[in-house]
């Protein structure tokens, strides 16, 4: 059965993901370091991992597999999930695949190097609004349908 895993720390689309999981009657797992209330929805569970770097990422990567969907902005986690057979959607609606994760990781690493070399070079994050939420919902619907065929 398809499970929707959410890298929940600072995820801006938890409620949208819950709506999709509820509509499809599929389990959703919020994974975080704490600070979230236990969900009232019986389809949604909360996993609180110990404090520490990448603890939530490690938990998600260890539990996801073919037919599952992961929502994350963390590219190394996305790479691990894709290698485990899961599908990955970013909160902005971009679907990550084995074909596009390599260039995304390379760009991420390059930008980290640039920021380390020039502390005044900071990225300018765009806003997150209705258009991004709508794009996320469309992508998640499409990916969940494909995942259900696998799982």
UniProtKB/Swiss-Prot annotation:
InterPro entries: UPF0178. It comes from the Bacteria. Pfam families: DUF188 (PF02639). NCBIfam families: PRK00124.1. PANTHER family: UPF0178 PROTEIN YAII (PTHR35146:SF1). Belongs to the UPF0178 family. This is UPF0178 protein Pden_1915. It comes from Paracoccus denitrificans (strain Pd 1222).
